[in-house]
Swiss-Prot record:
Name of the gene: prfB
Protein name in the entry: Peptide chain release factor 2
Pfam families in the record: PCRF (PF03462), RF-1 (PF00472)
Subcellular compartments: Cytoplasm
Family under the similarity heading: Belongs to the prokaryotic/mitochondrial release factor family.
PANTHER family, per database record: CLASS I PEPTIDE CHAIN RELEASE FACTOR, PEPTIDE CHAIN RELEASE FACTOR 2
Keyword Cytoplasm: yes
PTM section of the record: Methylated by PrmC. Methylation increases the termination efficiency of RF2.
Length: 371
């Protein structure tokens, strides 16, 4: 085998060994065994919330272990592919060598993607995520853009078999949405999606302009970790104002004949949360409380960071505005303004193919935090 190929394979094997050590593969196997025992308990589904959490954790752990084991097998198989190519002659040898090179390149990409997972070591990175999208400047185009972003993230979650729970959708009058809040129920969803927080900018020919002029639209993405009992985010009833109303759909149409939608106002902070996608008022209140607790946790941590930055004499860093630009006209390009990562296929990106942006964002964040 070519010495350069041998060196490449050895480097990939070493990187994968590091990944296996950081992920604690033996500990992962033990965790799967315990979760399987818990999942087999016939009484588990008496607590729906707990059952869903256990099955979700089990599925994620099994998928993670399978990915690592498959990568290890591919690393071990790669020298065999090159040996088989060396035994061929003429065009067959050339084709077999090209196939081995293609597998080497793909394996490098897949191992690097797995390596990114080891960078998610923040305090809340392993949590599930609550995502809120709000339309910004740009009128009806901005509302449509916010809905396109919502679809992008939901498609990404579906491609990874991550359950999504939509808490609230506030529809705009003509098209699109004013805002939406949904949860992505998967381990490390927060650590992964938190790099998406910021302002997303769309440039395109407006489908709502009868003169077909180019329009720039903005939408803001907020990503919060799901609150757990260990976070001690208590909200006294005296701090809440609860309003109920009828759920509404596109164009302001009522989609429910009862006052099942809930609006919670946290009086001390003025934070307002709404939920209307559940079937009952009680379910909507519970879901709204989960989002409110996530927002209060984020506020608490933000205040702690601000105090620490003041002590350091550091203004702190922010994701800032326009963290990513999506251009559909006059050319086609999606570019992250922090990482410089870019893709010339906006259709694929808007259909949920954002792993490259997520991986680049996570690496960028870790480099920034190390500085």
């Amino acid at each position: 085998m070519d010495p350069d190929r041998q060196a490449d394979i050895a480097a990939l094997a070493a990187t994968l060994t590091t990944v296996e050590r950081v992920l604690d593969v033996d500990g992962l196997r033990d965790r799967i065994q315990k979760l399987e025992q818990e999942a087999s308990d016939p009484n588990l589904w008496d607590d729906q919330s707990r059952a869903q959490k256990v099955t979700s954790e089990l599925s994620h752990a099994q998928n993670e272990l399978r990915r690592v084991e498959e990568l290890r097998q591919r690393v071990e198989d790669l020298p065999v592919l090159y040996e088989m190519a060396a035994e061929e002659e003429g065009q067959d040898a050339e084709n077999a060598g090209a196939e081995a090179d293609a597998e080497l390149a793909k394996l490098r990409v897949d191992i690097e993607a797995m390596e990114v997972r080891t960078l998610l070591s923040g305090e809340y990175d392993e949590r599930e995520a609550v995502v809120t999208i709000r339309s910004g400047a740009g009128g009806v185009d901005a509302a449509d853009w916010a809905e396109m972003l919502m679809r992008m993230y939901i498609r990404w979650a579906e491609q990874h078999d991550y359950p999504v729970e939509v808490f609230d959708t506030s529809y705009a009058e003509e098209a699109g949405i004013k805002s939406a809040t949904f949860a992505v129920h998967a381990p490390y969803a927060y650590g992964t999606l938190s790099v998406e927080q910021g302002t997303h900018r769309l440039v395109r020919i407006s489908p709502f302009d009868n003169q077909s002029r180019r329009q720039t639209s903005f939408a803001d993405v907020e990503v919060l970790p799901v609150v757990e009992t260990t976070d001690h985010i208590d909200v006294p009833e005296t701090d809440l104002r609860v309003d109920v109303y009828r759920s509404s759909g596109p164009g302001g149409q009522s989609v429910n004949t009862t006052d099942s939608a809930v609006r919670l106002t946290h009086i001390p902070t003025g934070i307002v949360v709404t939920c209307q996608n559940e079937k009952s008022q009680l379910q909507n209140k519970v879901a709204a409380m989960r989002v409110l607790q996530a927002k209060l946790l984020a506020r608490k941590k933000q205040e702690e960071r601000a105090a620490l930055d003041a002590l350091k004499g550091d203004g702190g860093s922010s994701w800032g505005n326009q963290m990513r630009s999506y251009v559909l006209h006059p050319y086609q390009m999606v570019k992250d303004l922090r990482t410089e990562y870019e893709v010339g296929n906006p259709s694929a990106v808007l259909d949920g193919d954002i792993d490259g942006f997520l991986e680049a964002g996570i690496r960028w964040r870790n480099r920034r935090d190390d500085d």
